[in-house]
Amino acid sequence: MKKAAIITIGSELLEGLILNKNAQFLCQELKNLGYIVVKVSTVGDDLISISEEVKTLLLKVDLLILTGGLGPTQDDLTRDAVAKVLNRSLKLNEELLSKIKEKIKKYHSEIPQNIERQALVIDGAEVLDNPVGSAPGQLLTVDGKIVILLPGPPRELIPMFNALKDRLRTPDALYQVVLKYYSIPEAVLEDLLKDILYSQNIVEVATMADHVEGVRLRLTTHMKNKEYLDEMVKKILDKTGEHLYGVNDEKMEEVVVRLLKDRKKTLAVAESCTGGMLSSLVVNVPGASEVFIGGVVAYSNDLKKHILGVREDTLKKHGAVSEECVQEMTEGLKKLTGADICVSISGIAGPSGGTPEKPVGTVFIDIFEHEHITMRYNFTGDRNMIRTRSAMMALENLRKYLKGRERV
């Protein structure tokens, strides 16, 4: 297999000021493209340090990717370092400079004087378009080896790298499918599928679980075994299809918005313990405005009463964290917004506020269209985990409801 190395550049990485998300992303992607990543290194904004690392790694790998250090300031030294190691000149690309200036004009009234540095191109390099930011990337071929310079911000790097994947794919490239589940525990899923997953040695199986994406079943094999894996996925879906919410990069909120559009339904949400988290997840999806009317964050009991019409008697008798309260929240929300489907959440996120009857992590979620579907949960974890799980489970329940399940 071909070998690859990654150099992430930036003193802020060495000082722990930002997470090195680029290294994680690139390692995963390069593995799928058929490379063995032999080294990931981080160096500061220092010309000698960058140059030495480039010189060393170029002797060992077929593909070298450098991230960061492509901005316009004096400490953006990646171009200079690579040019120095390769003994090539840096030339100002006037056409590229004009494009960079036009891009900057869309967002800023003044163009920095030092912006010319971003238009310096290493002799023989191919310029890589940056669809998000102003710093272009560069690609060079050196004695059969590929050197790629990419900007540091992940939101810029990811689409630029994705545009290169077809060119970088090797004969050892992998084929991978990730199946995503939320309301089924990892151990239960694995037990349900053990006869399919572990009666073969062609597909590598890995399960991962967290409170944001739920359980992810990652299936990986070589590209030549694609048909085998596709058949395996069909068998898995025959057993677990009703629990599946997404495949590969699909997010729960994207699936829910798509289902709402397909069924021509509008949505409104009323949140207490999640504090707008559910609304935020929904509006993160492009096109959500077609189906999402809005949300109410009714954190206090007064707001629950005055905005959503929850009765004083209900709050005194059952409390804000109760089946009765969330049902009245959705009923009031429906009157307020006229949405087809209303969802409400109320719970105890902690660390205080729990009782023996309703410990920290107790959460009620209600879905109301023509009748109520109310569920009680006892989530574990810290405050943020409980809030996140509440919002995600509300989406999962809504997904199941929209898919036509009688029970969520």
From Swiss-Prot:
It comes from the Bacteria. SUPFAM superfamilies: CinA-like (SSF142433), Molybdenum cofactor biosynthesis proteins (SSF53218). Coiled coil: none annotated. PANTHER family: NICOTINAMIDE-NUCLEOTIDE AMIDOHYDROLASE PNCC, NMN AMIDOHYDROLASE-LIKE PROTEIN YFAY. Belongs to the CinA family. This is CinA-like protein.
